[in-house]
Amino acid sequence: MNFITLLDYVGTFAFAISGIRLASAKHFDWFGAYVVGFVTAVGGGTLRDLLLGLPPFWMQNVSYLVVSGFAFLFVVGLRKYVIRLNNTFFIFDAVGLGLFTVVGIQKSIAVGYPMWVGIIMGTLTGAAGGMLRDVLLNEVPLIFRKDIYAIACICGGLIYYLCMYLDLPAAPTQFIAACSVILIRILACLLYTSPS
């Protein structure tokens, strides 16, 4: 398993938890909670693949269904702690956002698209799953609220390409870019509220 695949699976796990956790807090049944988690985990990547002219990734590899299932078991097993702690959603959402941004950029590079497409696809991969989650839960999507969400993905994409320009190896580039998205998202929520 290469580093980008590991990021993809960890991102799937984290985003699925964020969706399942919110669905459980809204008293969805188990099947509904799993569906929300799965859509959160694969929604952005599915839109990305369709725009890039590729078959959706999860239709070629059952492991994404399995990873989402493990996320479901994690939330069910620790539901008393996961649902009650407000910051659990935020933490898993930030991690998924950062990791999926990098996965989206890397996939765009692999099929030969230029930098600006990579940044857009990274942002879409990171943010669209959360947007679909919020729509399913009848919430205003985070991307449209005062939170710094898509901007964090764009900044991470720029950092990714800066690392490439500096000839850093692939794994450190991916790690730095993912961490930058996570850090920007966390700092923005802790320290800053965007203008009304």
Predicted segments, located by residue:
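Structural signature of hydrophobic alpha-helical transmembrane segments
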Residues: 2-10, 57-69, 115-124
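Cytoplasmic-side transmembrane-helix entry/capping segments in multi-pass membrane proteins
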Residues: 32-36, 62-64, 86-96, 145-151
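Short, structured motif recognition centered on aromatic/hydrophobic residues
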Residues: 35-39, 46-52, 120, 124, ...
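Helix-coil boundary and interhelical linker segments in multi-pass alpha-helical membrane proteins
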Residues: 1-3, 50-58, 105-117, 163-172
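Ordered, amphipathic secondary-structure segments that act as subunit-interaction surfaces
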Residues: 71-107
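Conserved small/polar residues in nucleotide/adenosyl-binding loops
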Residues: 192-196
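Loop-to-transmembrane alpha-helix initiation sites
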Residues: 61-65, 114-119, 145-151, 169-178
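Small-residue-rich segments of transmembrane alpha-helices in multi-pass membrane proteins
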Residues: 37-42, 94-106, 148-161
